[in-house]
């Protein structure tokens, strides 16, 4: 199972430097079970409205991207966030050397709990932390 981070979803929906790599990975990965969480929906809404506020996307483009993003998330195995995920995320954030932000620690904690073996993320700090939790990384540049 592969946990889908919101930044990968954004690269599928909006022009990003990594969009071609992500599209290529997804095209080669149709048999993978993708996992997400309700938190991805929240981050998606936030990321899209930031694109609108910064004039990178129009209101109409945001609406279209939001619909597409929610459809992609609906096709994933959406796992609920549990109290234990927050506790584990807090423990990860408490490790000063990790530099993890709370939202990223929450993604990692949930992915680990539900048995994901791999993380699909482009976040540098998450990519550094994931292997320490026994999670493999998708290399989008292959």
Residues covered by each model-derived region:
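Acidic catalytic patch
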Residues: 70-97, 104
């Amino acid at each position: 199972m592969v946990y889908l981070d919101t930044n990968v979803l954004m690269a599928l929906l909006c022009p990003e430097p990594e969009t071609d790599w992500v599209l290529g990975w997804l095209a080669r990965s149709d048999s993978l079970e993708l996992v997400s969480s309700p938190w991805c929906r929240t981050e998606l809404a936030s990321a899209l409205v930031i694109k609108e506020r910064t004039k990178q996307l129009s209101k109409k483009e945001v609406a279209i991207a939001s619909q597409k993003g929610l459809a992609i998330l609906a096709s994933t195995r959406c796992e609920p966030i549990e109290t234990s995920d927050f506790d584990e995320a807090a423990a990860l954030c408490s490790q000063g050397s990790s530099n993890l932000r709370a939202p990223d620690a929450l993604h990692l904690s949930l992915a680990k709990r539900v048995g994901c073996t791999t993380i699909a993320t482009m976040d540098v700090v998450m990519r550094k932390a994931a292997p320490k939790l026994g999670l493999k990384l998708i290399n989008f540049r292959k």
